[in-house]
């Protein structure tokens, strides 16, 4: 998910997406530990998307415009 797409979402949608991604990351890590993970790059993608969402939420808290 690109930052531009994330910026178009509301704060409530971002919070919901954040919780979904955290749950997905938990499941991916569990799959990695048990050797069932097919695409290890997915963990990196999910982590980066979580960071993007958190950054945008923080920017909105501080009133920073982009």
UniProtKB/Swiss-Prot annotation:
<dbReference type="GO" id="GO:0022625">
    <property type="term" value="C:cytosolic large ribosomal subunit"/>
</dbReference>
<dbReference type="InterPro" id="IPR018254">
    <property type="entry name" value="Ribosomal_uL29_CS"/>
</dbReference>
<protein>
    <recommendedName>
        <fullName>Large ribosomal subunit protein uL29</fullName>
    </recommendedName>
</protein>
<dbReference type="InterPro" id="IPR036049">
    <property type="entry name" value="Ribosomal_uL29_sf"/>
</dbReference>
<dbReference type="InterPro" id="IPR050063">
    <property type="entry name" value="Ribosomal_protein_uL29"/>
</dbReference>
<dbReference type="Pfam" id="PF00831">
    <property type="entry name" value="Ribosomal_L29"/>
</dbReference>
<dbReference type="GO" id="GO:0006412">
    <property type="term" value="P:translation"/>
</dbReference>
<dbReference type="InterPro" id="IPR001854">
    <property type="entry name" value="Ribosomal_uL29"/>
</dbReference>
<keyword id="KW-0689">Ribosomal protein</keyword>
<dbReference type="GO" id="GO:0003735">
    <property type="term" value="F:structural constituent of ribosome"/>
</dbReference>
<keyword id="KW-0687">Ribonucleoprotein</keyword>
<comment type="similarity">
    <text>Belongs to the universal ribosomal protein uL29 family.</text>
</comment>
